[in-house]
Structure formats: structure tokens, C-alpha cells
């Protein structure tokens, strides 16, 4: 069985964060948009669960392409780096839209932006075997449901997914006290990080 770190990285990649888009001029397919949006809630839960353990945060200057070159105030589109797992911040732009690997901002000075993004996860903190198993199974079933587009498979996968997601929520709630205790301990030891 995969380690929690491998599972977390695989899950982030599977859930629409790395759709097959290699050319910024290629339109993002509707299916990619739906796929990314469908997993948004689960993705947020996964990211929230592992956020304290994200590592390898990169800052990257990205050049973009104006959507309307004739308009100096045109929105600009950018393509996230291939290694980007999770976009944390676009400097100076609170109003931006993500479509798979494509980022669209209303206006970018000098047609360039700086991204802060997570390149990898090295430690996922507190995990449980039950979480590993149910989450990997849920992802597998959801991927089958989405990719096959078979009505029966969809219904079966969705039922199973909802059941496993409920179990995930229960496990997450159960571990809340442990996580809080762990967080407080880390804060208390902050002056001496090497002891952690």
C-alpha cells in the first residue's frame, strides 16, 4: 500500500489539479472544468487536513498572454507550471480564475505575475489507515465513474463515494482533538524547531 505522502500527492494530481493541458492556447475542455469543480470540496478538505505539512513552496514569475492584445487592460491568461500541485497565492490578484492549469487574471502589470504554489508534500501529519484506505478507494471509484460515463457505474460509484466520504468526515472529526493538541505542542516548541 502507498504511504500517506504518496497517496496525498496522487490524490491532489487526480482531482483535477493536473489536467492534460500543455498549450495555453488550447481551450480547457468542459469535462476538465466539471471534473475539477466536482472534486473541489473534497480537495479543500484534503488540503486543509495536510496544509501544516506542505513543503517545497515555490515562488515563480510567470509570463502570460493577453486575451485581447489590442486592449491594454485586457485580462491575461497564464499556464501554471507542470509541477504545481496547489496554487496558494497570485501576488496582488485576489480576483483570478483557475481552469485546470490555466489562470486568468483581470489585468496583470507587465503581463507577468508571481505565483506561490506547493510543489510537493513531504509529510501529511496525522493520518490513519482507515483514511488511507477509504480515500484511495473513493478516488478510484470516482475516477471510474467520471471516465466511463456509464450511468450504472456512475450511480454505484456515487453511492459508494458518499458513504466513504461520510466515513472520512467522521474520522476527521474524531482526530480534531489530536490535531489541536499537536498544533499547540508545535507552537509551544517554536523557539526550538530542531526539537520537533
Locate predicted features.
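Short, intrinsically disordered N-terminal pre-domain segments
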Residues: 1-24, 195-196
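Internal mixed-charge
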Residues: 7, 91-196
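Intrinsically disordered, low-complexity coil segments
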Residues: 20-25, 68-73, 106-111
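Short secondary-structure subsegments characteristic of cysteine-rich extracellular domains
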Residues: 27-46, 153-170
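Divalent metal-cofactor coordination and adjacent catalytic microenvironments
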Residues: 32-102, 127-143, 147
Amino acid at each position: 500500500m502507498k504511504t500517506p505522502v504518496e497517496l496525498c500527492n496522487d490524490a491532489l494530481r487526480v482531482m483535477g489539479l493536473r489536467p492534460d493541458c500543455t498549450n495555453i492556447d488550447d481551450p480547457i475542455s468542459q469535462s476538465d472544468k466539471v471534473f475539477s469543480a466536482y472534486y473541489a470540496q473534497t480537495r479543500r478538505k484534503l488540503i486543509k487536513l495536510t496544509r501544516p505539512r506542505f513543503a517545497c513552496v515555490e515562488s515563480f514569475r510567470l509570463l502570460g498572454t493577453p486575451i485581447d492584445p489590442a486592449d491594454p487592460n485586457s485580462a491575461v491568461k497564464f499556464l501554471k507550471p507542470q509541477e504545481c500541485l496547489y496554487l496558494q497565492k497570485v501576488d496582488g490578484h485576489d480576483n483570478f480564475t483557475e481552469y485546470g492549469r490555466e489562470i486568468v487574471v483581470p489585468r496583470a502589470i507587465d503581463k507577468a505575475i508571481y505565483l506561490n504554489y506547493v510543489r510537493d508534500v513531504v509529510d501529511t501529519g496525522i493520518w490513519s489507515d482507515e483514511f488511507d484506505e477509504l480515500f484511495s478507494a473513493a478516488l478510484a471509484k470516482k475516477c471510474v465513474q467520471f471516465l466511463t460515463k456509464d450511468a450504472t457505474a456512475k450511480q454505484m460509484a456515487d453511492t459508494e463515494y458518499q458513504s466513504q466520504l461520510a466515513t472520512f468526515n467522521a474520522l476527521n472529526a474524531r482526530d480534531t482533538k489530536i490535531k489541536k493538541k499537536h498544533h499547540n505542542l508545535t507552537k509551544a516548541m517554536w523557539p526550538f524547531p530542531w526539537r520537533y
